[in-house]
Amino acid sequence: MVLSAADKGNVKAAWGKVGGHAAEYGAEALERMFLSFPTTKTYFPHFDLSHGSAQVKGHGAKVAAALTKAVEHLDDLPGALSELSDLHAHKLRVDPVNFKLLSHSLLVTLASHLPSDFTPAVHASLDKFLANVSTVLTSKYR
């Protein structure tokens, strides 16, 4: 799915509004995913998955950092996320459906924190962006 110039502008603007809350929102999205889709917990058997856990916060920060990198490299997502794609495909072997579940949880989290900025156009652009990120992260499964 190709991001238009308007989509790229919407994604950059929305992520700019996230600002210093990226790690916090990443952790919240993970918690939301674990609660809404309990099967996703199977990939984190060694984590304390309770609310506010340091491990969930730490992984949320990693998710946020990866998304920040993706936003900074919208024109080369495969290059920017190549190592992360290798990790998830070859070492962690995460079921690709989980990226969609996390994307949904991220959209809900962003909508709850940025209600006035989360217009239908921004929602659509972020959804396309996260779908592209998911596609890149699962590209090495084949």
Curated annotation (Swiss-Prot):
Task: Kindly state which keywords UniProt assigns to this record, in alphabetical order.
Answer: Acetylation, Heme, Iron, Metal-binding, Oxygen transport, Phosphoprotein, Transport
Q: Where is the Globin domain?
A: 2-142
Residues annotated as binding heme b: 88
GO-annotated biological processes? cellular oxidant detoxification; hydrogen peroxide catabolic process
Report where it is expressed, by tissue. Red blood cells.
Q: Which residues are annotated with the PTM Phosphoserine?
A: 4, 36, 50, 103, 125, 139
Gene Ontology cellular-component terms listed: haptoglobin-hemoglobin complex; hemoglobin complex
Which superkingdom heads the taxonomic lineage of this protein's source?
Answer: Eukaryota
Q: Which CDD domains match?
A: Hb-alpha-like
PROSITE patterns xref list: GLOBIN
Q: Which Gene3D superfamilies match?
A: Globins
Q: Which residues carry this modification: N6-acetyllysine?
A: 17
Which residues are O2-binding?
59
Q: Which residues are modified to Phosphotyrosine?
A: 25
Q: Does the keyword Iron apply?
A: yes
* PTM sites of type N6-succinyllysine: 8, 12, 17, 41
Q: Which residues carry this modification: Phosphothreonine?
A: 109, 135, 138
Note the subunit structure. Heterotetramer of two alpha chains and two beta chains.
The entry sums up its family as follows: Belongs to the globin family.
The role this protein plays is: Involved in oxygen transport from the lung to the various peripheral tissues.
Quote the PANTHER family the UniProt record gives: HEMOGLOBIN FAMILY MEMBER (PTHR11442), HEMOGLOBIN SUBUNIT ALPHA (PTHR11442:SF48)
Q: What is this protein called?
A: Hemoglobin subunit alpha
UniProt lists the gene as: HBA
